[in-house]
Amino acid sequence: MPTITIISYFGFLLASIIFTLVLFISLSKIQLI
């Protein structure tokens, strides 16, 4: 099942990117205040 592995990999990568963006935005808001 290579397809499931690829989907899981991209899903994990997307989650990591979203988590990084949320963390970066949170830090930016804290600095603005």
Curated annotation (Swiss-Prot):
Location of this chain's protein in the cell: Plastid, Chloroplast thylakoid membrane
**Pfam families this protein is in?**
PetL
Q: How does it sit in the membrane?
A: Single-pass membrane protein
The task this protein performs is described as: Component of the cytochrome b6-f complex, which mediates electron transfer between photosystem II (PSII) and photosystem I (PSI), cyclic electron flow around PSI, and state transitions. PetL is important for photoautotrophic growth as well as for electron transfer efficiency and stability of the cytochrome b6-f complex.
Q: Give the protein family.
A: Belongs to the PetL family.
From the UniProt record, give one GO term of the biological process aspect: photosynthesis
Q: Where are the transmembrane segments?
A: 4-24
User: Subunit structure, per the record?
Assistant: The 4 large subunits of the cytochrome b6-f complex are cytochrome b6, subunit IV (17 kDa polypeptide, PetD), cytochrome f and the Rieske protein, while the 4 small subunits are PetG, PetL, PetM and PetN. The complex functions as a dimer.
List, in alphabetical order, the Gene Ontology terms for molecular function in this entry. Answer: electron transporter, transferring electrons within cytochrome b6/f complex of photosystem II activity
**What cellular component GO annotations does this protein have?**
chloroplast thylakoid membrane; cytochrome b6f complex
| UniProt-recorded name of the protein | Cytochrome b6-f complex subunit 6
- PANTHER family, sorted: CYTOCHROME B6-F COMPLEX SUBUNIT 6
Query: Which UniProt keywords are present, listed alphabetically?
Result: Chloroplast, Electron transport, Membrane, Photosynthesis, Plastid, Thylakoid, Transmembrane, Transmembrane helix, Transport
HAMAP family per UniProt: Cytb6_f_PetL
Chief place where the protein resides: plastid
Stored InterPro entries: Cyt_b6/f_cplx_su6 (IPR007802)
